[in-house]
From Swiss-Prot:
The keyword Ribonucleoprotein does not apply. The lineage of its organism: Bacteria, Bacillati, Cyanobacteriota, Cyanophyceae, Nostocales. This is Photosystem I reaction center subunit PsaK 1. Its main location: membrane. Pfam families: PSI_PSAK (PF01241). It is found in: Cellular thylakoid membrane. The cyanobacterial PSI reaction center is composed of one copy each of PsaA,B,C,D,E,F,I,J,K,L,M and X, and forms dimeric and tetrameric complexes. It comes from Nostoc sp. (strain PCC 7120 / SAG 25.82 / UTEX 2576).
């Protein structure tokens, strides 16, 4: 009984499109900007090669901001898909 209700509530899977990619890129840019303003020690060790290319971030800050950006992006994509916008 519960399984049939769960299957009836399931939506169609979202296919990748350039719109999804653009949303993910924008979400990551927002997360990196937010991280640049709020991370206390952005250049913590281990350092990345070509620090200027990565905005002076160390590996922990870069991983943290991009992970946060992916969480934001997935939330946006799934939310917009659920609303029927994409």
């Amino acid at each position: 009984m519960l399984t049939s209700t769960l299957l009836a509530a399931a939506t169609t899977p979202l296919e990748w499109s350039p719109t999804v990619g653009i949303i993910m890129v924008i979400a990551n840019v927002i997360a990196i900007t937010f991280g640049r303003q709020t991370i206390k020690y952005p250049s913590a060790e281990p350092a990345l090669p070509s620090a200027k290319f990565f905005g002076g971030f160390g590996a922990p800050a870069l991983l943290a901001t991009t992970a946060f950006g992916h969480i934001l992006g997935v939330g946006l994509v799934l939310g917009l898909h659920n609303l029927g916008r994409i």
